A protein has these predicted regions:
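Basic, amphipathic N-terminal segments
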Residues: 1-428
């Protein structure tokens, strides 16, 4: 009987798991059907046709590549999506990584072309998809929304199980330094909508990395970079952690990030002084100038990844600084205005702190994600089924033990009544 009960429990668990898988598959198909319905209404749109052809060409290139030696070419490497408004410097940052790509010209002197819809970057350890800034712009129109949804449909078709391994959210330092709360929150809200779409589409909360571009506009950044070696300039500059969930979690994460970053900058500054490196006034003030970005970044993060009872809370993983092109000027701060500026050594189109971010940080984080938190109907049903099953099993086991005890006691009583002489003989 015990074996039978165990078999029933195992069978029930397998049925629940199978039912959940069927439900997930049907829901994914339903989402695809919705996207396809929208696409059919715009099937004659040449922009969408170009988008589909471009995607298929890149996927075919992947399928025919040597990655098939290691398994499904679409699943061998992690995939990352890069989003940010037009002019934020995301395409420049990817171009200046100094990483090899099989289909893109990534020379340091290569001209930066605006992203039409999306561009693929096939790096050796990761696949990066750079998306058009208009997809996440507060001024986006209906056609931009249709293109974005088509892109999600294609992404779902290509990687139905794996989805995205991470999302890089790009915002430039100039916007953060200006600290226009209304604009930053508006930008963050639009990005939050796109992030929530992706989370619901793939049923997981993937890591999100905030990349602050155009960091050369921070007073002292370029002068400080000029004191570092080539190897140091390839390293990532930022903070990696896991934000807690709940109200104010993004603020706590931001506080830890800026404390960690500025402390390391101060230690490096001290180390430079000990080694006899000439420290200009901008280099001395650089850690303090970095702190000027914090208020604006707080406004942006609260709208982009802050807790919201109606939305899934994104998994904030890291904050990083980078520069793909040094303009030779910076946004003056309060402290820098009282000092005489030092001449800037021009470093034309040099990628700073980008190589390891795209080449090591992102690929190393593959497989890091959290399940969604909002309870949907299926989770409620499966949880209730689990409780009912657990109670049923406990009732069955208890009933079995009670019945066994009663049957054994009855049998012993019958034996004692049938052979009373044996008991008497034993006593003599």
């Amino acid at each position: 009987v015990t074996f039978a009960l165990t078999a029933i429990v195992v069978a029930l668990a397998l049925l629940i798991r199978l039912a959940r898988r069927i439900w997930i598959t049907r829901r994914s198909r339903f989402k695809l059907a919705q996207s396809e319905a929208v696409a059919r209404r715009h099937s004659g749109n040449p922009i969408l046709l170009d988008l589909v052809d471009k995607w298929k060409a890149s996927v075919d290139l992947l399928r025919k590549s040597s990655l098939k030696r290691f398994g499904n070419p679409l699943r061998v490497l992690p995939w990352y999506l890069v989003v940010g408004e037009s002019g934020s410097g995301k395409t420049t940052a990817i171009t200046r990584t100094r990483l090899t790509s099989v289909v893109k010209n990534i020379a340091q002197s290569a001209p930066i072309l605006q992203t039409g819809n999306f561009d693929w970057w096939f790096f050796s350890k990761a696949i990066v998809i750079d998306t058009a800034g208009r997809y996440v712009s507060p001024q986006s129109v209906e056609s931009d929304q249709i293109e974005w949804e088509k892109l999600l449909e294609l992404l779902t078709r290509s990687r139905p199980k794996d989805g995205l391994d991470g999302l890089v959210v790009v915002i430039d330092a100039e916007r953060l330094l200006q600290n226009n709360a209304e604009q930053l929150q508006q930008c963050g809200r639009v990005l939050r909508e796109r992030i929530d779409q992706l989370i619901r589409l793939f049923d997981r909360r993937f890591p999100i990395y905030v990349l602050i571009t155009k960091s050369d506009l921070i007073t002292g950044f370029t002068q400080w970079a000029n004191t570092l070696s080539e190897d140091q300039l390839e390293q990532a500059m930022g903070y990696l952690g896991v934000a807690k969930q709940g109200d104010g979690s993004e603020g706590d994460f931001l506080a830890k990030a800026f404390t960690s970053i500025t402390d390391r900058l101060k230690h490096l500054r001290l180390d430079m002084g000990v080694k006899g490196v000439v420290l200009t006034s901008e280099v001395l003030l650089f850690p303090s100038e970095v702190q000027r970005l914090r208020p604006g970044l707080q406004q942006f993060l609260s709208a982009c990844v802050g807790n919201n009872p109606y939305l899934e809370q994104p998994l904030l993983r890291g904050i990083f600084f980078a520069s793909g092109r040094q303009a030779g000027t910076s946004v003056a701060g309060i402290l820098s205005e009282v000092l005489r500026p030092s001449p800037i050594k021009q470093t034309a189109d040099h990628g700073l702190f980008l190589h390891d971010f795209f080449g090591s940080i992102l690929p190393r984080d593959r497989g890091i994600f959290l399940p969604t938190q909002i309870v949907n109907r299926w989770n409620q049903v499966t949880r209730n089924l689990a409780w009912v099953s657990w109670l049923a099993v406990n009732v069955a086991i208890t009933s079995f033990l009670l019945l066994s005890y009663a049957a054994t006691k009855s049998t012993l009583s019958q034996i004692e009544a049938a052979f009373p002489a044996i008991d008497a003989h034993t006593q003599v």
